[in-house]
Amino acid sequence: MPLTDDVKRTIRDVPDFPKPGIVFKDITPVLGDAALFRRVTEAMAAPFAHDAITHLVAIESRGFIFGAPVAQQLGAAFVPVRKPGKLPAARQREEYSLEYGTDALEMHADALGDRARVLIVDDVLATGGTAAATCRLIERAGGSVAGLSFLLVLEFLHGRHALAGRRIESLVTF
């Protein structure tokens, strides 16, 4: 069976989570299948295998799960982007808008060099706000974003619009 079919079949729908009317796409069954998880991370890395990626930036927290093995496969440095106050050294910060209010992301100030060629990895592309803020953070730090790789894209939330002009790869869409 093709990988996309295996992933779609394995992701669990959880109705009314985290609130009524929402159908949550639970990726933990994908993580629970070691062979499938390996295939997924290999497939997330493959489109960027010849792009001279120097750094992989993963978005807290599920992006870390996929990002670490993808970074290893690409021979790239792993850089976590975290919620404020979680990183111990000097940090750069990027604020972004939410439906009601703002949030922020941080990255160590010395995590990237001026010639860093970066792949961003996360589990889900929804509205694109977090991913767009991560792109801005990387570019402000002197890096260039080669692309973004997601396990899945929720197309009905139009996250690709927030990342217009960026290379986006995903294994499945809903």
Model features per residue range: what roles?
Residues I53, D114-R115, G165:
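Phosphate-coordination loops involved in phosphoryl transfer and adenosine-cofactor binding
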Residues G21, L56, F78, L148:
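Residue-level signature of catalytic and energy-coupling elements of molecular machines
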Residues M1-I53:
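Active-site-facing substrate-recognition patch
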Residues A76-L119:
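Short, glycine/charge-rich flexible loops or terminal/linker lids adjacent to PRPP-binding catalytic cores
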Residues I53-E60:
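Short glycine-rich phosphate-binding loop at a beta-alpha junction
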Residues P2-L3, R9, A132-F174:
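PRPP-dependent phosphoribosyltransferase catalytic core
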Residues I65-L74, C135:
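Short Gly/Thr/Asp-enriched flexible loops that form oxyanion-binding sites at enzyme active sites
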Residues D123, G128:
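Conserved G/P- and acidic residue-centered "switch" motifs that form tight phosphate/ATP-binding loops
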